């Protein structure tokens, strides 16, 4: 794990992107953060301030939040913008009633709810931002948490979270259980909207907690790792996005899931007992379920991606240090989540 080098890389990638707001100077680099904030930082003592600390540390241009709550009539986006201002950081964002949120160093020209319109499970929020002469459509997603079917091969029920008598090894049965959730429907709605953005020449980014792994991480090379128990499976959301032409930033840069698994859940958190961090206490439940996707064109190129959070994970109710080639930015202090975040930096060609 190459910590110091990648902290330096992140800092260097931010050069030239410190002019914020409507009259921002065109930039050649764009850094994006996806972070599940575990019920708005309320689970871990000091969690809200820790969220602000980590956003300030990463200094991302765009931040996607999952598990926004707006407790007791408060506005999380307004609160976090004020907390970041006290740390010398200026961000823009707008309130919304969903459990996701978007921050930007650049003014947001429009924000709209994409999913659900009427009913459904999960949330997708869209914001439109102008950067370096480009229109950038950014989408923040938190998909349905129910029917967490990647637990089935590990011998746990993804709806009741109870241990089963034996694992499920049949990929078709696992996918049938997976499709009871509304994750696939949400991604289809995203694609319908993103197609219009792409047709109009916009750069499109999607960040989110999918509550579902990637098919790229569940193939022959990993079937005997991490309690996959011999299962090879093409998970729905990542497969749909791949077919549509979207690229998983982390896997684009690190195509080998054995050397760079990029696990984002369950993260260790030294402020919490292990029992609060695991849902499958006798299994290796590690997966990469937090993502940053982009639609490739000549104007956007991914140049780096890192994991934000502790370099430890929970495996069979034990705190273990990851022995991988993943690159970590470790927390400044308190870690506010049971997930790890994902950071991606892109080169943007100015218009």
Please annotate each region the language model reported.
Residues 40-42, 70-74, 121-122, 146-149, ...:
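Active-site environment of divalent metal-dependent phosphoester hydrolases
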Residues 2-3, 7, 19-86, 97, ...:
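N-terminal, active-site-proximal structural segment of metallo-dependent hydrolase catalytic domains
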Residues 115, 195-205, 210-351:
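Metal-dependent phosphoester-hydrolase catalytic domains
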Residues 136-160, 211-213, 251-259, 312-313:
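Short, solvent-exposed beta-strand-terminating loops
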Residues 151-180, 221-223:
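A solvent-exposed, charged loop/short amphipathic helix patch at secondary-structure junctions
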Residues 13-16:
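N-terminal signal peptide c-region/cleavage motif recognized by signal peptidases
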Residues 30-37, 51-74, 127, 138-141, ...:
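Active-site beta-strand/loop signature of hydrolases that rely on acidic residues for catalysis
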Residues 44, 68-157, 304-307:
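Structured beta-strand-rich core segments of catalytic domains in phosphoester-bond hydrolases
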């Amino acid at each position: 794990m190459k910590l110091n080098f990648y902290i330096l890389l992140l800092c260097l990638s931010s050069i030239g992107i410190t002019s914020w707001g409507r009259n921002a100077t065109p930039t050649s680099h764009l850094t994006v953060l996806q972070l599940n904030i575990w019920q708005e930082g309320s689970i871990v003592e000091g969690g809200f301030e820790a969220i602000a600390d980590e956003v300030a540390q990463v200094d991302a241009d765009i931040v996607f939040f999952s598990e926004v709550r707006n407790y007791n009539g408060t506005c999380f986006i307004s609160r976090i913008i004020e907390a970041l201002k006290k740390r010398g950081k200026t961000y823009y964002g707008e309130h919304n009633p969903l459990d996701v949120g978007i921050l930007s160093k650049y003014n947001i020209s429009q924000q709209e709810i994409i999913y659900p319109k009427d009913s459904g499970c999960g949330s997708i929020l869209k914001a439109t931002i102008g950067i370096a002469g480009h229109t950038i459509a950014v989408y923040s997603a938190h998909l349905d948490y129910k029917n967490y079917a990647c637990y089935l091969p590990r011998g746990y029920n993804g709806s009741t979270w109870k241990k089963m008598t034996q694992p499920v090894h049949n990929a078709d049965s696992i996918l049938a259980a997976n499709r009871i959730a509304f994750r696939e429907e949400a991604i289809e709605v995203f694609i319908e909207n993103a197609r219009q953005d792409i047709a109009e020449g916009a750069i499109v980014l999607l960040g989110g907690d999918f509550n579902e792994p990637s098919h790229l991480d569940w193939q022959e090379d990993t079937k005997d790792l991490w309690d996959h128990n011999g299962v090879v499976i093409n998970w729905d959301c990542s497969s749909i996005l791949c077919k549509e032409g979207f690229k998983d930033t982390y896997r684009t840069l690190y195509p080998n899931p054995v050397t760079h698994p990029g696990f984002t859940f369950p993260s260790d958190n030294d402020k919490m007992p292990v029992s609060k961090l695991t849902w499958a206490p006798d299994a290796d439940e590690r997966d990469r379920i937090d993502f940053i996707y982009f639609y490739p064109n000549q104007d956007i190129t991914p140049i780096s991606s890192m994991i934000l959070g502790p370099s430890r994970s929970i495996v069979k109710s034990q705190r273990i240090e990851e022995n991988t080639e993943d690159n970590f930015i470790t927390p400044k202090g308190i870690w506010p989540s049971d997930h790890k975040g994902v950071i991606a930096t892109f080169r943007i060609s100015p218009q």
